[in-house]
Design a protein with these regions (language model features):
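Buried hydrophobic core positions in alpha-solenoid tandem helical repeats
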Residues: 1, 28-30, 67-68, 112, ...
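Long hydrophobic alpha-helices with heptad-repeat/coiled-coil character
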Residues: 55, 66-67, 84, 116, ...
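Short, charged N-terminal helix-start/capping segments
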Residues: 64-65, 69-72
């Protein structure tokens, strides 16, 4: 069995980061126009910008238009349903960050920032599917850093004096790893995402 569209895009992003433009990424981008879903659209845009792939492979404007069409009326973006999800909204912001000042992107970009600020928990962290977790907070920090926002000082993202950086560090365990949830043990996915976020 082949890779899913989202997995193909993830692999292509990793390969581009490691070795620059490559045939696998170019093939993936050629197919990207047929992919559906907010995450595929976000990853397509990130991949396009990883190594300045040409528009001939996949139109940036078309991907941006598709991505913007997934915005939920009540705010943010989600895999499904009518309520925004911090994880997905953050991934979209990361993808759109190079275009945040474009007239067709800026209004949605600012609304999504406002949405994330409004759903930030008192701990400084973020929840997905009702559970506060390290990975959601990490995705938001990556999005804010990509957008040039100082998550430790911007008042929109300080709750009870705590930032998303504070929330992420609360998941750190004595073995150096990071847990998925507050009372959990170190988790590989949480650790990778936390380190990526803190380095962003």
């Amino acid at each position: 069995a082949g890779f899913s569209p989202t997995d193909s895009l993830r692999i292509a992003i990793a390969m581009t980061a490691a070795k620059g433009k490559n045939a696998f990424a170019e093939k993936t981008l050629k197919n990207a126009g047929g992919y559906s879903g907010v995450i595929s659209a976000a990853y397509s845009l990130i991949l396009l910008d990883c190594a300045a792939y040409p528009n001939e492979l996949c139109s940036r404007s078309a991907v941006i238009e598709k991505l913007l069409s997934y915005e939920i009326k009540s705010g943010g973006f989600a895999f499904s349903g009518s309520r925004g999800d911090p994880d997905v909204s953050a991934m979209v912001l990361t993808a759109l960050s190079p275009y945040k000042n474009d007239s067709d992107v800026s209004p949605c970009f600012e609304r999504t920032l406002s949405f994330l600020s409004s759903v930030q928990n008192g701990s400084g962290g973020f929840s997905s599917f009702g559970t506060e977790n390290c990975e959601s907070s990490s995705q938001v920090l990556i999005a804010l850093s990509s957008s040039g926002i100082d998550a430790a000082r911007d008042v929109r993202f300080l709750k009870n004096g705590r930032s998303v950086c504070d929330a992420i560090m609360s998941y750190r365990r004595s073995d150096g790893g990071f847990a998925h949830i507050s009372d959990g043990n170190s988790d590989n996915t949480a650790t990778v995402q936390a380190l990526l976020a803190l380095l962003s």
